[in-house]
Amino acid sequence: YDILSDNEIETLLTKSDLELDTSNESHKPILHGVSGRVIKARTLNQRKIIDSVMKNDMVFAIGPAGTGKTYTGIALAVKALKNKNVKKIILTRPAIEAGENLGFLPGDLKDKLDPYMQPLYDSLKDMIPAEKLKKYLEDEVIQIAPLAFMRGRTLDHAFVILDEGQNTTHSEMKMFLTRMGKNTKFIITGDPG
């Protein structure tokens, strides 16, 4: 820890000289959505995410809102699950917008957090038929949880996406990055702006 300076980290995160192999998987469809729509990289940066995930176990996808970072990551996770490369998908976000007012909302914790986690559910609904998605969620093959729930876990045989990583504290990010176990892929998305 604390081996790289802030400037070195910034340089590594903003580097744009990643070589793309045009013959690789980044140009092919990732998968077919429930409506039959082909889900594939639509931009150079989405292809970079695919290429990076194929070469690395941990990828930081940094860019403005609405550029497909999370959607591309979730599509890659669903593909890995379908191909039996992983046993589960874990999607997480820091629940900062939910703040301390959760206790005043009606329902259990899931009811309180679901609106904040809705963008993740929306992406999954595009890619997995409703009944199968329901079963995956019930069986915890797909888990959607706030970042605080990752503490103390070791995540093996999983595809894990931390969405909205810019909203984490230093200690939350450190805690998350140390959860990686065997045969696990991590994608951390964020918007530095």
What is each of the regions a protein language model found here?
Residues 62, 71-139:
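Conserved P-loop
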Residues 1-26:
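Interdomain "pre-motor" coupling segment immediately N-terminal to P-loop NTPase/helicase cores
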Residues 55-61, 87, 157:
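Pre-Walker A (Motif I) flank of P-loop NTPase domains
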